């Protein structure tokens, strides 16, 4: 039976970023659904202060619809989509970047709805909370200035993270490009940057949201490594794979590797679409034993 790929975006992103990938999947004969987590997509806040000419003071204080949204809200929303998708047959759940936190928590809660879980350079916390991984050696080369230089307002007062992706500051744009799309042209980079929304929620979960062997560990899983990713470095991706395998040695990751940066696979999606398409007929680990 044909599976449905359910695609979950990362921070500051939305379903729009999956459009090229969905086109490739569709042309290969695969069905897919791109999710907008709560407060994303057409639920996002784009204030007039964000338009040109920008109003920096207004942008720093304007309320955002994503305020108060939690990881639990994201998971509940995703589970509702998984329940609908599951009525049509097998479900392959795919998360990118911060989306990995949500798909991990969803697999902890409802493994019965997921036939395979796929991380594309995505977070899957096992031994540490996500924020704590940033202090680990694998993340030493990640420069927080990429976001800090364009951060707007006080997150504690706003109740959200706000980044001015429409900044014209050369240093900020250079930091964004280096972190996420160093192998793209300037035109591709700026186009992708304009699909981002300025606001993201604050909740990245805690120890209870780490991968749980009794539930998450039952789901066949794949990790797609992005070799040139500077935002989620390959060393950290490999550590997450290793920790996941140690947690569930009888259900190890099926590991795939793609060349390119954090965003390249979404702009040039043919290799990723082929890799994902191969998973549609991949048997579960128990069936391969």
Residue ranges and their predicted role:
Residues 108, 114, 118-163, 204:
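Flexible "cap/lid" loop of the alpha/beta hydrolase fold
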Residues 12-20, 32:
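Serine-hydrolase catalytic-loop signature spanning alpha/beta hydrolases and amidase-signature enzymes
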Residues 248-289:
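Catalytic active-site module of serine/aspartate enzymes centered on a nucleophile-bearing elbow/loop
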Residues 100-111:
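Short glycine-enriched nucleophile-adjacent loop
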Residues 10-13, 96-98, 123:
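Active-site glycine-rich loops that stabilize anionic/oxyanionic intermediates
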